[in-house]
Amino acid sequence: MVQQHTPPSDLPVRPPSKVLGLLSAGALLLAACAPGDRVAHTEVGTVDFPTSCSAEAQPELERGLALLHHMMYPQAAEAFGEAARIQDDCAMAHWGLAMANFQPFWGSADIEAGRPHAERAVALEPDTERERLYARAALAFFQGEGISYGERVRNWEAAMEALHTTFPDDPEAASLYALAHLSVAPADPGHQERANRIVREIHEAMPEHPGAIHYAIHVHDVEARADDGVSFARAYEDLAPSIPHALHMPSHIYVRLGEWDEVIDWNRRSADAALEHPAGEYISLHYPHALDYLMYGYLQRGEDEKARGILEELRSRDGYEPHLASAYALAAIPARWYVERRDWEGAANLEPGVPESFDWNRFPAGEAMTWFARGLGAARIGDLEGVSEAVDRLETLETALQNRDDYYWAEQTRIQRLSVTAWRSLAEGQVEEAIQEMREAAELAAGMEKHPITPGDLQPAHELLGDLLTEAGRYAEAVEAYERTLATWPQRYHSILGAARAAAEAGQDDVSRRYYEELAELAGDTDRDEVAEARGWIQAN
């Protein structure tokens, strides 16, 4: 059991710091007028991080660590940078500057930017063994050349385990070890459960610890665990009311449960807050990330005009932070607009690489979203040349991701390519081949967990399988495919609709009624044609 942290004997005992950033009126004015992305005036939660650095640097270290736990990396770098400005030989300030260049759960790191700070933290030889282990753990990730990202994360996990084992009552070491352990294998049930035990113990001892709550939500952002994550989602809602990612994180649980009102509410607040916290000269990745969740939620409820507003809002701005989360959202939002509304002509004509100011070459997985939508759209309208172009481009992007050792997104792109290939086969009249290809894609998808940057697939593979089986007249099998989707993604509009239609064709009237009633309840306040269809079927049967 992690108790309230007792600092090492060579440091003064003091209570955990609740990082409120309570500034004088003059300092508040200075912070408001200064450039950059400081968040010193906001509440960011409770951390317990005694160090041997000066009393003047200590509040910045605490705020920086809390922001690391919130995954607000540019803002954390600002705080740690201020600590280093106050005391340049503060090893933990340089540790923090290194860690702000490492985003473990997003699979991202700037090795060249972070390494000098990790090396400096170690070279300064901090006064305590605990701080020396923190510094060495950062260097374990950043040191060396020609090392894959996955190996770096495993090196960091091993170093964090050593730190946690040596100082088991340090909640910061424990929470960061839980993050490291989860980052190594986020889909592994054993890793999930060990991380869960650690963060639950921290949360019991420190209910406002941002890392414990945040990482617990990630632990439960997997199939079959979301129900147990609701308490953490509720705890995070009020912890840091001005931090964009804190406002967003509860929706990782709510999207798993199909609670669209909650998804919409929290991501609207997150998007608005993100505009107040730029990433230097860029619009923070947290803004388009939240908009993608908003778009997804509105479309599942059939609220097309509100969804259109999100697309227009996204396109009204430029200068997005160059990050995979931004790339994904920039591609996914317009793709969702067409695919979720079954506007196949629009999907087939999506333009890749928009906006042009964004560096798409760095993010093949983002570009793949556009080509996936284009391929599906082209297949549905019978444009075989367009389908083949999409398949070829997806194959190129898949290879590029493999060459970068980005195996997760390479596999996701493979699933997209196989799905488009299946629909091409159907368009060519090769029904059995199409079903076989789509089943292969669906089974591959079933073995992969959702990445935290997405609220859900553009169109889940089992839903695509259900659509394809419906087209082939194999209605009972289609119902099974849709129900498999709904077991993972409850309250998905088109899986509910597909199940209702396929069940009706299969003569399963009770099943059809249940799904049509569910659809009418989900989107009953909208003017979508399918809602009228549902009500008409219920009335006639």
Task: Label every PLM stretch briefly.
Residues 85, 122-123, 204, 234-238, ...:
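Amphipathic alpha-helical segments of tetratricopeptide repeats
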Residues 91, 98, 102, 110-126, ...:
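TPR/TPR-like (Sel1-like) alpha-helical repeat modules
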Residues 67, 101, 140, 181, ...:
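Residue at a conserved register position within TPR or TPR-like alpha-solenoid repeats
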Residues 54-55, 88, 126, 168, ...:
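Short coil turns that delineate tetratricopeptide repeat
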Residues 70-78, 97-132, 136-151, 184-190, ...:
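Inter-helical turn/loop elements of alpha-helical hairpins
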Residues 55-62, 89-100, 126-146, 169-185, ...:
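Amphipathic alpha-helical repeat scaffolds of TPR domains
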